[in-house]
């Protein structure tokens, strides 16, 4: 209907937020959370999404998302003369599921295949990770 989405309304400057990276198997749930609800209704409650506290962070993260960026809102900008907004956040902390972390040569590595992030391409199109490959960096 052209009105500002609740997400943008809730993300005032200085607010805390969590950016979750969903696993490809969560595509139905991600799509379900896009349903239009009255402002006082939460998509978390409407979809029975389990939440987990994270150390001393003021917000809870989604329990079964493999990656969560714990952020503070820097600014929100309206794009052109449209009702589209972009929100800039500062990532202050990162959660990665232990099942997606490996150690190699003394370095912590995130296993991209274990995360298998859901990519939203636009409209109703999504993608999975596809092929994962390694390229040596120049010296």
Residue ranges and their predicted role:
Residues 1-139:
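Basic, polyanion-binding surface patches
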């Amino acid at each position: 209907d052209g009105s500002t989405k609740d997400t943008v309304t809730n993300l005032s400057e200085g607010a805390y937020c969590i950016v979750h990276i969903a696993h490809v198997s969560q595509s139905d749930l991600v799509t379900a959370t896009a349903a239009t609800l009255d402002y006082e209704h939460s998509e978390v409650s409407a979809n029975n999404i389990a939440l987990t506290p994270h150390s001393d962070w003021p917000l809870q993260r989604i329990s079964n998302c493999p990656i969560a960026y714990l952020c503070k809102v820097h600014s929100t900008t309206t794009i052109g003369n449209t009702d589209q907004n972009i929100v800039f956040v500062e990532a202050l902390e990162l959660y990665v599921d232990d099942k997606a972390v490996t150690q190699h040569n003394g370095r912590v590595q995130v296993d991209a295949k274990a995360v298998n992030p859901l990519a939203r391409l636009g409209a109703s199109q999504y993608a999975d990770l596809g092929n994962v490959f390694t390229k040596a960096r120049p010296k």
